[in-house]
């Protein structure tokens, strides 16, 4: 019996087979492949390739949120190394184009720009001095970013995030609806985790928010905390489990201190903020209408001074949509604490003279 020496001798015609696997491209504008029917490609830029920036980029990549990710950093060798490390995993990841550069031109045409770059605090340096250095850095990077991507959404992650969100808004020239900060989105996740541990439930079944400053003065909104629709404070009362203001403040304090604990153990935080920002990116890019506590320009929220950027629960969305902001219901004590927290942010903003 004669052995076949080619696919054609087996009756398999390569030309015919290719037509089965690959659809011909037509220049006819009425075909589904025309420009009118093509899905618009999504581009996300991450400014700063440090631990936080790369955790964000990696999480956005694995969640398949963008068709192109641009990485920008001032250190070219580290930047290229980070990009190559991700590119080498291409066989295991969604198909996403990765580009990098030290120049802001690589971000051109971005839909979402995420800023993680920031100066690190020097020993003995005051918070105000650190803030002034970060403002100087933002003066260098924000205007070029705005110039490269006129219609982008700007998401600030650098700390102090509430004040720097205000700075980015002022320097970009963008409307306030297109500049937000990561705010207390991560604080709220930590809050939900700690409550879930206390109550022995899944954190995804806990509804709880931290608002105000992303920092020491953040406010836990206990009045709206619920598990499976049951208000937590009411549930504790009905089960005769003891709690008092001191216990509640202890949990809030644990939320605030949790970042310091992670830093003391591993030197920095990265993964939690990576997932937090990726969740914001998904909500913004896909218009999911999910509620997030993010830093936004507060205009009359519970008596907070106009021009203050502070975290409030709202559904961040593309500006073409109707405004998503809605005022949370707070007790008078919670509103008082929120105003006190916002005052700290407002005072720092006034010192900058922007």
Curated annotation (Swiss-Prot):
Enzyme active site: 214 (proton acceptor)
Region Disordered, annotated ranges: 302-332
Binding residue positions for NAD(+): 73-78, 120, 159
Pfam families, per database record: Ldh_1_C, Ldh_1_N
GO cellular component terms given for this protein: cytoplasm
GO biological process: lactate metabolic process; pyruvate metabolic process
Gene3D superfamilies xref list: Lactate dehydrogenase/glycoside hydrolase, family 4, C-terminal, NAD(P)-binding Rossmann-like Domain
EC category: oxidoreductase
Involved pathway(s): Fermentation; pyruvate fermentation to lactate; (S)-lactate from pyruvate: step 1/1
Domain of life, per lineage: Eukaryota
Binding of substrate, residues: 127, 159, 190, 269
Induction conditions: By hypoxia.
EC number(s) on file: 1.1.1.27
Catalytic activity: (S)-lactate + NAD(+) = pyruvate + NADH + H(+)
Disulfide pairings: none
Alphabetized UniProt keyword annotations: NAD, Oxidoreductase, Stress response
GO molecular function: L-lactate dehydrogenase activity
Family: Belongs to the LDH/MDH superfamily. LDH family.
Subunit structure: Homotetramer.
Name of this protein: L-lactate dehydrogenase
Organism field: Zea mays (Maize)
Lineage: Eukaryota, Viridiplantae, Streptophyta, Embryophyta, Tracheophyta
């Amino acid at each position: 019996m004669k052995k076949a020496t080619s696919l054609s001798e087996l009756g398999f015609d390569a030309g015919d087979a290719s037509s089965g696997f690959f659809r011909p491209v037509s220049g006819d504008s009425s075909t589904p492949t025309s420009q009118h029917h093509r899905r618009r490609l999504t581009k996300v830029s991450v400014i700063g390739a440090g631990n936080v920036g790369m955790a964000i980029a990696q999480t956005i990549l694995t969640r398949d949120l963008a068709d192109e990710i641009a990485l920008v950093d001032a250190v070219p060798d580290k930047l290229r190394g980070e990009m190559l490390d991700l590119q080498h995993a291409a066989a295991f990841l969604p198909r996403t184009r990765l580009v990098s550069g030290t120049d802001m031109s690589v971000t051109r045409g971005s839909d979402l720009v995420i800023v993680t770059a920031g100066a690190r605090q020097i020993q003995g340096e005051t918070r105000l001095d650190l803030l002034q250095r970060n403002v100087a850095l933002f003066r260098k990077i924000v205007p070029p970013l705005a110039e490269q991507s006129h219609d982008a959404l700007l998401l600030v992650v650098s700390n102090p995030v509430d004040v720097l969100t205000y700075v980015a808004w002022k320097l970009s020239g963008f409307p306030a609806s297109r500049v937000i900060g990561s705010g207390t989105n991560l604080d709220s996740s930590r809050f939900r985790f700690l409550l879930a541990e206390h109550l022995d439930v899944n954190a995804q079944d806990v509804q709880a928010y931290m608002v105000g400053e992303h920092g020491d003065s953040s406010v836990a909104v206990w009045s709206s905390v619920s598990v499976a629709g049951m208000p937590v404070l009411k549930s504790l009362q009905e089960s005769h489990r003891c709690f008092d203001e001191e216990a509640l403040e202890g949990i809030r304090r644990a939320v605030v201190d949790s970042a310091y604990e992670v830093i003391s153990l591993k030197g920095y935080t990265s993964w939690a903020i990576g997932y937090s920002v990726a969740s914001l990116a998904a909500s913004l890019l896909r218009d999911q209408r999910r509620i997030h506590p993010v830093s936004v320009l507060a205009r009359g929220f519970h008596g907070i001074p106009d021009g203050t950027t502070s975290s409030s629960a709202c559904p961040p969305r593309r500006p073409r949509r109707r405004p998503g902001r809605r005022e949370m219901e707070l007790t008078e004590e919670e509103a008082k604490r929120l105003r006190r927290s916002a005052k700290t942010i407002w005072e720092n903003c006034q010192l900058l003279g922007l």
